[in-house]
A protein has these predicted regions:
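PLP-dependent class I/II
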Residues: 1-185
């Protein structure tokens, strides 16, 4: 909901369909929007009965995060949000570059998104052109020959795709594309 750049405002399920309000639980965290990866702070909002049941399960399955992480998360959520807007602008610029560059690589087809810091191109044609079995083999090839780490789409139930992060500098992305072109063609 924070890393989003479409012209239309973000709409939650409960806003889109008020009849679902009493059955909707929204789960989020601070890792992505506030660059607090590893702090492991999440939160949920929803009907009191569901949240109460979630608290019972959570209290028996995990321990609490440290108080420093909790205080930092509260400060992030309640503080000035301009850093999130600036980060989102940077992500959008990197997204636009990466999607365009990936679509110039033979056998890669990547759709534009409205907010994320991952690209998820369909690489089925590249897999076939390289004589590979699947996205796992392509990921292995890219790691070995291009020294580019990607996550096979099959890890997300999407065989024939790969996931690349663009939570890095534009220079790093340009080098990534150069290496991908060298290996793929």
């Amino acid at each position: 909901e924070h890393i989003y750049w479409a012209p239309e405002p973000f709409v939650s399920f409960a806003e889109a369909c008020p009849a679902l309000y009493d059955r909707t639980v929204t789960i989020n965290g601070v890792s992505k929007a506030y660059a607090m990866t590893g702090w492991r702070i999440g939160y949920a909002g929803g009907p009191k009965t569901i949240i109460a049941a979630m608290k019972k399960i959570q209290s028996q399955s995990t321990s609490n995060p440290c108080s420093i992480s909790q205080a930092a998360s509260v400060a992030a959520l309640n503080g000035d949000q301009s850093c999130v807007r600036e980060m989102t602008k940077a992500f959008r610029a990197r997204h636009d570059y990466l999607v365009a560059a990936l679509n110039e690589i033979p056998g890669f087809r990547c759709l534009r998104s409205a907010g994320t810091f991952y690209a998820f191109p369909n690489v089925s044609e590249a897999i076939q052109a390289k004589g590979l079995k699947d996205d796992l083999e392509l990921a292995s090839l890219l790691l070995k020959e291009a020294e580019v780490a990607v996550v096979p789409g099959s890890a997300f139930g999407a065989a024939g795709y790969i996931r690349l992060s663009f939570a890095c500098s534009l220079d790093t992305l340009k080098e990534t594309i150069r290496r991908l072109r060298r290996v793929i063609g």
